Amino acid sequence: MRIHFLLFALLFLFLMPVPGNGGIINMLQKSYCKIRKGRCALLGCLPKEEQIGSCSVSGRKCCRKKK
């Protein structure tokens, strides 16, 4: 039973974001953006695009063409 607590603690530490680097969180957000037919923009969306989310903790935006 104690091994469950140890595994849970290790999983929790693995998923915690490191300051300055989102790691797995950034990867998940980027994948979610691609699934929604978007692209990750560094500064902002183009005039014919709308923001549908974010791609990283650092502020990259997920954009796609307006419908």
From Swiss-Prot:
GO terms for cellular component: extracellular space. It is found in: Secreted. Keywords: Antibiotic, Antimicrobial, Defensin, Disulfide bond, Secreted, Signal. One of its GO terms (biological process) is defense response to bacterium. Residues 1-22 form the signal peptide. Disulfide bonds join C33-C62, C40-C55, C45-C63. Gene3D superfamilies: Antimicrobial Peptide, Beta-defensin 2, Chain A. GO terms for molecular function: CCR6 chemokine receptor binding; chemoattractant activity. It comes from the Eukaryota. Pfam families: Defensin_beta (PF00711). Exhibits antimicrobial activity against Gram-positive and Gram-negative bacteria. PANTHER family: BETA-DEFENSIN, BETA-DEFENSIN 103. Belongs to the beta-defensin family. This is Beta-defensin 103A.
